[in-house]
Amino acid sequence: MNGSGSQGAENTSQEGGSGGWQPEAVLVPLFFALIFLVGTVGNALVLAVLLRGGQAVSTTNLFILNLGVADLCFILCCVPFQATIYTLDDWVFGSLLCKAVHFLIFLTMHASSFTLAAVSLDRYLAIRYPLHSRELRTPRNALAAIGLIWGLALLFSGPYLSYYRQSQLANLTVCHPAWSAPRRRAMDLCTFVFSYLLPVLVLSLTYARTLRYLWRTVDPVTAGSGSQRAKRKVTRMIIIVAVLFCLCWMPHHALILCVWFGRFPLTRATYALRILSHLVSYANSCVNPIVYALVSKHFRKGFRKICAGLLRPAPRRASGRVSILAPGNHSGSMLEQESTDLTQVSEAAGPLVPPPALPNCTASSRTLDPAC
């Protein structure tokens, strides 16, 4: 984060220089370890559920998959290194990682915010123009949008490759900002505008219009249909994810603005506040799988299937009849049935109710023919 490369070590040494016990040296790594564990397992499960059987085929699924990739990259590539700031006085990972870690932090942050903005537009089109938007909301266009998202993220985070550097300071090896104060202030302001302020404005506008449309155009006939319930449910889930992103990253950006445009003295209280802002912003990368599990029953079922498959031994080879019937239990993706055109009705009427036998099935029909 901004200034986190060396200021953490400097503040730790300044505030804890009396030789007393430093609680942040123990408590902060524990919280980081919890974030790392929950985030790694949760996002890995999300990716496994969406990729299992090629289920990430809808636009919403692809965007959620991309969000999971960004969160997992942040957890694996950034959190372990940032945790050492509060436990070690020195930066021990070398000059290359000093630049790369901070670059990846802002790369994944931009990718997450742009993805949330894109999925908010996707939800608005799916709700407001369900028929006319089908030609636009295709997997191919979603992949193109994801490529554009990462391209923009690289563009806006690229300068951070030179923002930080490793150097010696008072017999310590530190990773600290290398730019002058005016350049850093301009860069931090641009980061706030493009990675937070503009995406939040897009999220607010699209979801406000989506909710307004949903509540003003409730049709008593179609409101209770499986398709409408599914679209409302997945929209609610994405709104929760977007709100959590805004809330989790708000303290970090507010703190940075206070440093540059207000008064932020280096005291024990402000140091604790900076640690808290880091923890809250980092925790955003592990809360999305929890939201999916709480809101989406399809994700819960997918999580249970993945966990059950990991815990139980490999099953024996199934017979031909079982192998044909098995795919029927996975006819829809975990989120696809909730997101666009597929509905929850297919789940209730498909896997649980066997299809009736056709009257013209004869002995010539093979036993493996699913129609018989």
From Swiss-Prot:
What ranges does the Extracellular topological domain annotation cover? 1-28, 82-99, 163-187, 259-260
Q: Which domain of life is it from?
A: Eukaryota
Task: Provide the alphabetized UniProt keywords.
Answer: Cell membrane, Disulfide bond, G-protein coupled receptor, Glycoprotein, Membrane, Receptor, Transducer, Transmembrane, Transmembrane helix
Question: What molecular function terms (GO) are annotated for this protein?
Answer: galanin receptor activity; neuropeptide binding; peptide hormone binding
Residues bearing attached sugar chains per UniProt: 2, 11
Using the UniProt annotation, give all residue ranges assigned to the region (Disordered). 353-372
Q: Which Gene3D superfamilies match?
A: Rhodopsin 7-helix transmembrane proteins
Give the matching InterPro entries: GAL2_rcpt, Galanin_rcpt, GPCR_Rhodpsn, GPCR_Rhodpsn_7TM
Q: What Pfam families does the entry give?
A: 7tm_1
Per the UniProt entry, the disulfide pairs are: 98-175
Q: Which residues lie on this side of the membrane: Cytoplasmic?
A: 50-60, 122-141, 209-237, 282-372
One GO CC annotation, please? cilium
According to its UniProt entry, the protein's GO biological process terms are:
adenylate cyclase-activating G protein-coupled receptor signaling pathway; adenylate cyclase-modulating G protein-coupled receptor signaling pathway; G protein-coupled receptor signaling pathway; galanin-activated signaling pathway; inositol phosphate metabolic process; neuron projection development; neuropeptide signaling pathway; phosphatidylinositol metabolic process
The transmembrane segments are 29-49, 61-81, 100-121, 142-162, 188-208, 238-258, 261-281
Q: Where is the composition biased (Polar residues)?
A: 361-372
List where in the cell it is found.
Cell membrane
PROSITE patterns found in the cross-reference section: G_PROTEIN_RECEP_F1_1, G_PROTEIN_RECEP_F1_2
- State the annotated membrane topology for this chain: Multi-pass membrane protein
According to its UniProt entry, the function of this protein is described as: Receptor for the hormone galanin, GALP and spexin-1. The activity of this receptor is mediated by G proteins that activate the phospholipase C/protein kinase C pathway (via G(q)) and that inhibit adenylyl cyclase (via G(i)).
The Swiss-Prot or TrEMBL record describes its family as follows: Belongs to the G-protein coupled receptor 1 family.
Indicate what this protein is called per its UniProt record.
Galanin receptor type 2
Organism, by scientific name, is Rattus norvegicus
The gene for this chain is: Galr2
